[in-house]
Curated annotation (Swiss-Prot):
A single Gene Ontology CC term: cytosolic large ribosomal subunit
Name this protein carries in UniProt: Large ribosomal subunit protein bL17
Stated family: Belongs to the bacterial ribosomal protein bL17 family.
Comp. bias (Acidic residues): 149-162
Source superkingdom: Bacteria
GO MF annotation, one: structural constituent of ribosome
Residue span of region Disordered: 125-181
């Protein structure tokens, strides 16, 4: 059995609240970010995230469920073809609310609600770790190559000692140049 939403409604009646949320969600999916009151943004956030979750599933049933709430077919098409697949590997947290200064006329607290366009923080951290580990792996490999070259080119012990000293000086100069950069 349907139960009414608890708490104050945006705009008075429940039908007006549904219309406000549908219009706000349409604007959010169309523009990527909207500026509204903080209360409307907080109510819109779970509403929009549920619609994005439907879009991630992408089947006909979920498309019809979204069309019950959002009447603009172009926005629904963009939601299912662009927004849903973009968040395919993300489990929730599709929107972000940023508080901004109060509205000039009535001093209402305002906020910007936007779709998160960055990939997850963990994937960025994993990429940074991979880059750091490859840099660490490359540094010892370069030193090993210098030693191998010295061993191959030396024919006698005296030549080897001179070449090792020359290679060490070259390696020190290269390290100093890297530190300056």
């Amino acid at each position: 059995m349907p139960k009414p939403t608890k708490g104050a409604r945006l705009g008075g009646s429940s039908s007006h609240q549904k219309a406000i949320l549908a219009n706000l969600a349409t604007a959010l999916f169309e523009h990527g970010r909207i500026k509204t009151t903080e209360t409307k943004a907080r109510v819109l956030r779970p509403y929009a995230e549920k619609l994005i979750t439907h879009a991630k599933k992408g089947d006909l049933h979920n498309r019809r469920e979204v069309l019950k709430k959002i009447r603009d077919k172009d926005v629904v098409h963009a939601l299912f073809e662009e927004i849903g697949p973009f968040y395919a590997d993300r489990n929730g947290g599709y929107t972000r609310i940023i508080k901004v200064e109060n509205r000039k006329g009535d001093n209402a607290p305002m906020a910007i609600i936007e779709l998160v366009k960055e990939k997850t923080v963990t994937s960025e951290a994993d990429r940074a770790r991979r880059v750091a580990s490859t840099k660490k792996a490359e540094a010892p490999a370069e030193e090993a190559k210098v030693e191998e070259v010295v061993e191959v080119e030396a024919d006698t012990a005296d030549d080897a000692a001179a070449e090792v000293e020359g290679a060490a000086d070259t390696a020190d100069a290269a390290e100093d140049a890297d530190k300056k950069d």
